[in-house]
Amino acid sequence: MTFPYDISVIVPIFNSETFIEPCMECLLGQTVGFPRMEVLLVNDGSTDGSEDLCRRFAQQYENVNLISQENQGVSAARNAGIRAAQGKYILFLDADDTISANAVEEITAFFDAHYEEIDLLTYRLYYRNEEGKTYGHTRYQILKETAVYDLEENIHVAQSSMNICVKNRLEQNLLFNTSLALAEDQFYIMENSMQKKKIGYVREASYFYFRHSGATTASGNHPYYCFDHFLYFFQLLSDTYRLPDGRLDRVAQALLLYNFNWRLKGDVLYPYHYDAAEFEHAVDRLRYYIGLVDDDVILSSPHVDPFHMNYFLRMKREPYQISFGPKRFAVHSEANLWVDEDRGELVFRKTRLRGGTLHLEGFLKCPASDFYDISLYLKLDQDRGGTPVALTPSAFSRYKSSVETNRFWAFSCDIPLEGHTHIAFEIELEGRRYPTRYYFTVRAAFGKKQRKLMKGHDLVELDFDKKEEIFTGFTVQKLSGFAFILQKLKMEAHYLRRNFKGFFYRKAAGKRKHEIWLYNDRHGVIDNAYYQFKHDFGIADRVKRYYIVDAFEDKKHYFTRKERKYLVKFKSLRHKLLFLNSSKVLSSFHSPGVFSPFGSIPLAYYDDLLYYEMVYLQHGILHAHLPNLYEKERSDIDRIVVSSDFEIKNFRKNYGFLPMHFIPSGMPRLSTIDRTQRPERRIIFAPSWRKNLIGPYIDNRRELMPQQFLSSKFYCEINRFLQSPKLSALLDRYDLALDFKNHPIFEEYNAYFQTNSSRIHVLSGPAKMETYQMMITDFSSIVFDFVYLDRPVLYFVPDYEMFRAGVTHTYREMDLPLEKGFGAFTQTAEELLSQLERLIENHFVPEPMYQKRMQDFFLHKGGEDELLYQYLTQKQEQ
């Protein structure tokens, strides 16, 4: 068979006008020679300028053809291209992606050389994000060299993306299954490769896949949109590749597992928006499909983390046994060994040597603990029995996932060094003891680059097993005389070699003549640290206070001339020296990237010198469930300022804080709210933003997504409310105004909110909350200002089901559920209008239930900044 072209490149296009030119440029620049290629631009009903651009290229080049059709989806678009293809081979390229200049030449040459062996080949895939960074894929642990690979021997290739090329078999060409709403590419690849069960790989060619931030939700891969769709793909895969003995073909098993794995890690496996009964049924359906995957397929996958292997094995609910030997322990099913280990692993997150005591904090991770109870023992010197170490469930049990995948155990211990020479830990399983190995995170003072810590005359050194290349214990020495002087010189030489500039910062530490307190808000933000600094600054108590700023010009007008002398630029030399000598860091944000001039990772280099207490002032009352951000085990927080009994209970129950961590003074900003000011006849409507309706930061600006925004339930229902004749009439009747205030991230969408009423205004910039009679919101923490003012609140969440699914926010549940909040909870414009009318007719007096919740919420109302100062100085005096 003779073909007029070496290859046909099929480019499906839907509203891709910004990407078409770069895509075509990569094809025009192919080393094989552009005239030897056919380019099929398939316009799938675009509504932007895509078709005109494509037509221009088709008119300019005779080997570029435009196919236009009504919008039918990417599968139908590719099928149209396949039917029209005149090249010997067919290559697929999405409009927002590109390929390397040599790709077509390398691909066609390889296919020509192996034509009878394979029907499909792949080539190297690189993910590229908005910042231009590229990164590879785990399948290249298998596909290492250009060759033909037997899929029965390499089941975990799991080719799932369209960096592929197939033979053009004309009438015998396979088409994409248009009944699949997703994973149509995976099924097409399986169909084209399973007849020969071989796949070609061309390492020299590259496909650059443009990964949009937030694309998981935008493209419909989120369970909210597609849970039944991806289960249908699982069903089709299992029906098509079922073997005569009833088992699923192992190549199909590996592809199933691959999909389970990336969905688990991306938190898009479970349909959290289902009610309890529906959710349990959904989990059972997932268990059925993971049950089709053999244990050894799970255990041999290069894509799956070993601890996630345990998760999937337990998900299958197969019977298992645990064996405990004198030196090893194992977990196994009837046919497969799941776990085979000789020791547990301790992950140390915080290590600190102070006042003759070694503080160690971290978590125990051991594969066997997913299946069996485990204990941890501290062994000092030759103590054979050891001392039990208290274990609590670790926040890191959500391992590389938002789902609790494993049973890890948190520990914290303070070990007096006096009289001891060695420290080690053992785990106990079924009465048998096993040793441990140690891993140190970037925030721990110990690690591969720091095997010794010295404080005063105490030296603690890590034990390193050279054969196993692991850390196994700590050796303790009390130094004196010449040994002390020599070791001190060695330590200084080590720090000098490790970080030349940092060494001189270390030498400047510990030189303070008085107490130093640092106050931090975030760039561009005036928050609790500012208000507390203003309160504390004039107090004569021998404490030097400094407020940290990113840019003097941005904030200097907030300060008096005298105060400006104590403004310090973030990450400046002065900031670093003050930080190393500070006794308190008061910050509205608890990330080290906000309050530390050294950032998070380099901070460990100075950890043995730091004495500051990190006081987290908060930037609002935490009412959304955000364990990965706020758990004590994950954070650098020493003490936390709380304003309510709710917060104390919440931080204890959900985030692992203890009574000693709380400062119950209330946030300093609250003291600036004027509770005596009479409100104007105004209502504020201030919703939060949605992560699925706006793009990433590009050049310090969020990328807008107008199509998604305008079609969203969030926008449509808010607009219905704002344009409602009933709302206009209500405002006229009671002589009221309503200010709609988008979240700052969403302010660029303000132009889309239109109203015919002169009483409704769309605001930009700040608003003074004391001037409003009431607030309408969804999840905004500003609601607590109105609780503080004893003014009514209404909740309005038109996309509540999407919120529960995890589509709209970084959280999907509330620590303080809206149904138990401070006002009626509504989801439609009609419900909101009805509740608003009731409140207005009742002269803005909330129902008794909501009044009581407001009155009982705050610990204090007034003087929070002074109370905080008293709490901080009381502890200092103690």
Which residues are covered by each model-predicted region?
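Conserved catalytic-core segment of nucleotide-activated headgroup transferases in glycan assembly
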Residues: 247, 524-533, 537-540, 668-752, ...
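Active-site and donor-binding regions of nucleotide-sugar-utilizing enzymes
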Residues: 360, 396-399, 424, 428, ...
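Conserved donor NDP-sugar-binding/catalytic core segment of glycosyltransferases
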Residues: 102-137
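Short aromatic/hydrophobic "clamp" motif used to bind/position activated sugar donors
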Residues: 90
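Glycine-rich, basic loop-to-helix element that forms the pyrophosphate-binding segment
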Residues: 69-85
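Short, well-formed alpha-helical segments that are part of the catalytic scaffolds
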Residues: 16-30
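A conserved acidic beta->alpha catalytic loop
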Residues: 26, 43-52, 94
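Catalytic binding pocket for nucleotide-activated donors in carbohydrate/polymer assembly enzymes
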Residues: 659, 752-756, 781-857
